[in-house]
């Protein structure tokens, strides 16, 4: 694994990529290819990414100014068939970690007077399956 200068930045970069991917692929039952190609899913992902980055900055994480572009470029390089584990879990009827992903972004954003409508909505949609369903 590469050595990083600031572990908080590295963790938040990963969270910026993953949090909207998790929520969108689970709620829409889609792949990254769908997010890349569909303008509605594309916008939903990018807005969720911006919300996550804004929260990281509000928490004092020194994210790069162009984090949204960096993470979109990273997502664009991932296989189209990829889905977040949350999407796989929902289809398998397993419990979801939504409270710690989109739920956390929504909750912490509210605590810091930030609006996070994408994560608030993804959290609300996915709550129905939070405890799993067979």
Which residue stretches match the model-derived regions?
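NAD(P)-dependent Rossmann-like dehydrogenase/reductase catalytic/cofactor-binding core
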Residues: 42-134
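Internal alpha-helical scaffold of NAD(P)-dependent oxidoreductase catalytic cores
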Residues: 1-66
């Amino acid at each position: 694994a590469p050595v990083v200068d600031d572990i908080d930045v590295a963790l938040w970069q990963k969270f910026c990529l993953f949090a909207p991917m998790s929520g969108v692929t689970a709620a829409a039952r889609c792949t990254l290819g769908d997010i890349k190609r569909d303008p509605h899913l594309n916008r939903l992902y990018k807005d969720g990414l911006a919300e996550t980055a804004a929260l990281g900055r509000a928490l004092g994480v020194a994210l790069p100014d162009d984090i949204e572009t960096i993470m979109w470029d990273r997502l664009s390089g991932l296989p189209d068939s990829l889905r977040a584990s949350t999407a796989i879990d929902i289809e398998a009827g397993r419990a979801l970690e939504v409270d710690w992903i989109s739920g956390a972004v929504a909750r912490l954003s509210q605590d810091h007077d930030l609006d996070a409508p994408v994560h608030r909505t993804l959290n609300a949609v996915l709550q129905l399956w939070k405890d799993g369903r067979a």
